[in-house]
Amino acid sequence: DLRMSRGLGDVYKRQEILIPLEDAQAIVLSHVNRTEVVEIPAWQAAGLPLAEDAVADIDISPFANSAMDGYAVRSADLTQASDEAPVTLDVIGHEAAGHVFEGAIGAGETVRIMTGAPVPEGADAVVKYEIVDVLDGDGNEGSRARFSAPAKVGENVRSAAEEAHAGDVVMHAGEVVAPAGAGLLASAGYASVKVHAAPRVGIISLGTELVAPSKVPARGQIRDSNSSALMAEALDAGAEPVFYGIAPDDEQAIAELVHRATRECDFVITSGGASAGDYDYVTALVRREGEVLFDRISMRPGKAITFGLLGGKPYLGLSGNPAAAYVGFEMLARPAIRKMRGFAEGVRPVQQATLTHGVKKRQHRRFFDRATVLRDPETGELLVTEAKTQNSALLGTMQRANCLLRIDEGPCDLAAGDVVDVVRVDLPEGTVL
């Protein structure tokens, strides 16, 4: 419920407590809206949800047509046809796709027809070319064709309006256009369609110690890896990412970048400066000029996450630790961006897998450990193995992980052979497993 979700924010912004992930997700989703509707070429809509119904302007197909190359016939002429008593018909014309035979087929007549061509008036079946004997000529007008079997009414004929009638909805608002669906839209008369615009997501890296990837860091410096990862993740979620650069630990510099991003974007994300340290200027800015709805989540990695509103725009402050920023984006930013783009709300698919080793958990928070799930080639069983280290600063474990091992709240000892839940970060939302 939207009002309940917004109310949760009122509760948590007044209390310095670790909030459950589900509450955090509900708060974020309740404070983002779908973007404006724009019109784009239909072929560019592949992978995107439509903003409105697509309605056929004509019947699809507008005429009955042949499903294969052959001869259009009156089935009544061939009711007695057999190998012992074949029926011979006069070929009175030839028809190909785009070249219409204007006449009508009468008793004892047939027309050579190609796949996709309109079935001539009077014909109610098509006999495929391979089983017809041409007695003389080249098989076109002036030839005779011999048939050795009956033809059923409708045989090898695609009916008019078989796909849709004029006025039918061929694709509903919210339905994601498949590549082949672009062809369906074209058949319904759509050269362009309406979708929700890609939300502009402003990304800012915070920290005096950060340098651009192109620079060699000096002692005490590190390359800014989070901005590249977050830009890629935002793009994958359906956003238009905009990088505003690296802000040093300076209150004025941070404020200038955050204000600019807030003016120009639909959603602002920062990484770094989200802990309770001395240099957490951005959370103080949001608290002073907007509102902070929560600033800690019962989750690892990603405990120190701030969400609020600044200038009426959603703001998400992620940890500077790469793994924490990644999990925070997956759990909070990605669902929000997809909602803004018009996708149905949802999360990555979750499936069960068998642990290949033991896992001990002593903290109460929910864990999302980087892992790899594979199917045993002999038994078909899904097996999940954690990365050797869960150090949140190591990027290689995120590159090679295809899932997050989800361990719910509370201490526990998991043993090899236990069945656990894994979040498939390699699969899109809505995937049926």
Regions picked out by a protein language model, each given a short descriptive name:
Residues R14-L21, A191-L318, P322-G328:
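Helix-rich terminal scaffold detector
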Residues D10-S82, R112, F343-F368:
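Short, low-complexity N-terminal leaders and the immediately following helix N-cap/first helix
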Residues V28, G70, G167, I203, ...:
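Residue-level signal for inorganic ion chemistry
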